[in-house]
Amino acid sequence: QMLSALAEELGGVIEESECVLVSMLAGVTLERLEALFPGKRILRIMPNTPCAVGSGMLFLCRGSLAAEQDAEAFRQLMACAGRIDEIPEKWMDAASAVAGCGPAFAYMFVQALADGGVECGLPRAKATEYAAQMLLGSAQMVLQTGAHPEKLKDDVCSPGGSTIAGVHALENAAFRAACMDAVTAAYERTKGLG
């Protein structure tokens, strides 16, 4: 309802403009946007909060009238935000659930690791710093090596060692299932927003 009212209010201004309309409205499809703004070049995007520090993930899909040059201009404008991936629109809600909502899940993980560090005697600030840097470095290992996360995990686990004991504790707590459930719940909610 609010989107329809906004489209009505802005319609005249947008009609007279040669601008590219960029939407980051979660769950609002290109089809709906093109119906509200007929004849306009539209890009649908979804950034995540780490874009604010240049390490984000931003998804982009083009409407039927948007040209490659429109997408390229947007990519150049937003290059400082982090990685940009042009994807099929059918992936947008799932990609948003993983990378758009994922930072909240990552922050919870960093906080939980820091809490564990505090329980083991580390000062809070140091435990948080170590957990955050570990997550940053681990993410870079995945991106730069191209190795499967399972292999990278196994590389850290020595037989009978402390890491495999911690992995066992996470498996007993259904860590992976909880992460998958979080993404699925976010995806279902996003689909319902449109």
Spell out what each predicted region is.
Residues 1-60:
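Rossmann-like NAD(P)(H) cofactor-binding subdomain of soluble oxidoreductases
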Residues 42, 92-97, 149-154:
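Short pre-catalytic strand/loop immediately N-terminal to key active-site residues, enriched for Gly-Thr
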Residues 2, 29-32, 105, 113, ...:
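Hydrophobic alpha-helical segments typical of transmembrane helices
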